[in-house]
């Protein structure tokens, strides 16, 4: 199928619900008009004062939410990092609010500037009045204060500090608006096709959206491009001005093999999480959007990762069995001998890519 035809097919599928909505809407609008005319004749409906009520009635009748709806279903994906194979997905391409998962991209660009020599871990990041005024979660920095780049990294990874995220944006691009445009450009360059960033923190903005699949792409890019900085994502606590801040990612402490990466929450998004876990030489990346609570989100993440680790182990054992030579006799172990539980896995270090590479799943 030609590329243009594929695009048309995808657009038709995406817009089909809206066409049916419009058909239902035509009938509903006719009945609403009739009803409002009758109410006005009875003196119940007054166009000037009842406009808001009328709009709410219309939206309910058309099946539209009066306010941005909270995610009612999980959007999740699990991939095997080494192969890029999608092992599990559910609503992985649905647009969702990323919340503080946004800060993963903020950190990606900070690491990019440090690696390029435009900053160092000791560089000071000034705090503006706008940055200091950001709503929690925050470090409650004051205008005129500054924080080192390394302290800023810890603050985003653990406390998920919105004031620090805005300060980073202003340091790197002059304004947060310019930084958000840079974030979106980088997202497209990495292969995050449906992601748009509007700020550096993930604070509510109706135009700031992403998908579970896109966030998996970002997690892969972060580990691939900045392995030297990835250790920060396993930080479980951070001390600032005599106070200790714990990492919101509880999987670091309670789920074996977890070494990253970031949580996120706003009311409209539910509880989100990107996690990377390595066991027996196999690394999986999981993304979950839309948990009702942080605990239910964590349980869901652990469940889908458990299932896929079992699946990968089964496939690996099956492949190993098929690859075993069948012409040579294999003696059974002597009584009392024990076979090793696992064999050592050699790991090769790869140099980070000079330019961003697109990742597709």
Where are the model-predicted features located?
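N-terminal secretory targeting signals
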Residues: 1-75, 79-82, 87, 118-120, ...
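Active-site-adjacent loops and short helices of periplasmic peptidoglycan-processing enzymes
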Residues: 2, 59-213, 220-223
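Generic detector of intrinsically disordered, low-complexity, polar/charged segments
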Residues: 22, 32, 40, 45, ...
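Domain-terminus/edge residues, biased toward the C-terminal soluble/receptor-binding domains
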Residues: 192-196, 204-361
């Amino acid at each position: 199928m030609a590329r243009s035809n594929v695009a048309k097919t995808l657009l038709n599928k995406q817009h089909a619900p809206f066409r049916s909505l419009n058909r239902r809407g035509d009938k509903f609008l006719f009945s609403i008009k009739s009803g409002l005319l009758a109410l006005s004749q009875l003196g119940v409906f007054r166009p000037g004062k009842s406009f808001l009520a009328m709009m709410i009635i219309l939206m309910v009748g058309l099946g539209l939410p009066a306010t941005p709806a909270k995610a009612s279903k999980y959007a999740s994906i699990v991939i095997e990092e080494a192969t890029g194979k999608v092992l599990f997905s559910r609503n992985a391409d649905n647009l969702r609010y990323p919340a503080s998962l946004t800060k993963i991209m903020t950190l990606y660009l900070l690491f990019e500037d440090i690696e390029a020599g435009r900053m160092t871990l000791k560089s000071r990041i000034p705090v503006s009045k706008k940055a200091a005024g950001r709503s929690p979660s925050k470090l409650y920095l004051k205008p005129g204060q500054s924080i080192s780049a390394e302290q800023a990294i810890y603050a985003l990874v653990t406390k998920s500090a919105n004031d620090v995220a805005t300060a980073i944006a202003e340091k790197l691009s002059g304004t947060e608006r310019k930084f958000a445009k840079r974030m979106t450009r980088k997202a497209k360059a990495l292969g995050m096709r449906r992601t748009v960033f509007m700020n550096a923190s993930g604070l509510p903005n109706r135009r700031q959206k992403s998908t579970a699949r896109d966030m998996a792409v970002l997690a892969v890019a972060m580990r691939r491009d900045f392995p030297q900085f990835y250790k920060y994502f396993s930080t479980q606590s951070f001390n600032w001005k005599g106070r200790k801040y714990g990492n919101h990612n509880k999987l670091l402490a309670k789920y074996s093999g977890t070494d990253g990466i970031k949580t996120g929450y706003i009311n409209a998004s539910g509880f989100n999480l990107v996690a990377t876990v390595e066991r027996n030489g196999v690394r999986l990346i999981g993304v979950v959007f839309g948990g009702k609570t942080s605990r239910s989100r964590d349980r869901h993440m652990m469940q889908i990762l458990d299932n896929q680790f079992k699946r990968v182990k089964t496939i690996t054992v099956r492949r190993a069995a098929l690859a075993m030579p069948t012409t040579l006799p294999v003696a059974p172990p002597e009584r009392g001998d024990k076979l090793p539980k696992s064999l050592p896995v050699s790991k090769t270090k790869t140099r980070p890519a000079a330019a961003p590479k697109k990742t597709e799943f």
